[in-house]
Amino acid sequence: APTATPLVADDSTIRTAVALWFSNRAAADATYGPISRWETGEVTDMSNVFGDAWSFNDDIGAWDTSGVTSMNSMFYGASSFNQDVGGWAVDCVTDMEAMFWYASSFNQTLGWCVDDGVRLSAAFDFTLCASTSCGVKQVAGGCGGCGPPIVDAARRLAGASSALLALALL
């Protein structure tokens, strides 16, 4: 059987595709390809995408989240979810409130560093990793940059060049 071209999602189509995926997974796979391969780089709002999806536990770790600004309640009540999403780019996210609330199987160390202005209220409540905030730390000014990767890389390179120049002048 031919393989579907993976979905290239935006804020609207991701919700349509997820709804189909839950109501008729075979049809969703035939239409959009496997959920693990969906192209999500154009999505900015992932709020509640898997809200109350108590049986969801598929691998979406390769999703491109670099443009996402809201993950509010993304896995709210997704009590079976325990996949590694630590590789997600979350530099642009400003709202993670209740992101994993009652995702009671979730026990991953995410390793994310986010700006101290990111809304994290109840983000990890009732998860197995709540006591450690699932490895998420907040830092004033964030830890990266929000923008196209080339711009962020240029900023880091410029900062490194300045530091090397300062050392050379000592």
Predicted regions mapped to residue ranges:
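Negatively charged
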Residues: P2-V151, G159, L164-L170
